[in-house]
């Protein structure tokens, strides 16, 4: 899907933007469902209490419902991000399999050799692990892929713990808990 739409039809080619759009399309339904479930699990008495205090429906949503649903929303974002970090298949066909040599003196966003260009090919850690294991061009491929997998795992763990701390902090800050 991502290859056909973003690479071929929109003519973005193998690029960061093609990979990002493909991953967004793939993960949007799951994230939407998680946010919807979080908002539905806010007890109706809290909504009614906000309305009984005389605040508008919009203020009830902003000041009562969303702060109460925030841990579930953060969880949904973390789950979707975890899937994105480990995604290799969609990125192989949309973002490419290798990163080009970058010209660090070139800051033109449209140049494919610029480090800030979203139109250049890219290689994520998950794609790197797949590529090292499947091509066999590196003599110590097992060690390189194991090291890359360890870096990816550590990064995901740090991200998850950071997201949990952020969710707890925001929940305490926005609610009376």
Language-model features: locations:
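Generic hydrophobic transmembrane alpha-helix motif, especially the helices
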Residues: 1-20
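Small-residue-enriched core segments of transmembrane alpha-helices in multipass membrane transport
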Residues: 19-27
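Transmembrane alpha-helices
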Residues: 31, 35, 57-95
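Membrane-helix/interface signature in polytopic inner-membrane proteins
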Residues: 36-47
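Interhelical loop and adjacent transmembrane-helix boundary motif
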Residues: 91-152
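Generic alpha-helical transmembrane segments of integral inner-membrane proteins
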Residues: 153-165
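Short cytosolic juxtamembrane segments of multi-pass membrane proteins
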Residues: 167-177
């Amino acid at each position: 899907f991502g290859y056909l739409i973003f690479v071929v039809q929109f003519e973005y080619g193998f690029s960061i933007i093609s990979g990002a759009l493909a991953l967004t399309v793939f993960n949007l339904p799951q994230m939407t469902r998680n946010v919807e479930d979080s908002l539905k699990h806010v007890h109706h008495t809290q909504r009614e209490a906000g309305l009984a205090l005389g605040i508008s429906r919009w203020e009830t949503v902003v000041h009562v419902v969303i702060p109460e649903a925030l841990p579930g929303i953060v969880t949904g974002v973390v789950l979707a991000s975890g899937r994105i970090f480990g995604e290799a298949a969609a990125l192989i066909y949309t973002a490419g399999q290798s990163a080009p040599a970058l010209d660090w003196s070139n800051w033109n966003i449209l140049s494919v050799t610029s480090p800030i260009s979203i139109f250049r090919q890219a290689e994520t850690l998950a794609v790197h692990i797949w590529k090292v294991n499947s091509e066999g061009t590196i003599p110590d491929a097992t060690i390189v892929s194991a090291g890359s997998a360890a870096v990816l795992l550590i990064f995901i763990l740090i991200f998850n713990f950071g997201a949990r701390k952020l969710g707890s902090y925001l929940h305490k800050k926005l609610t009376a808990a």
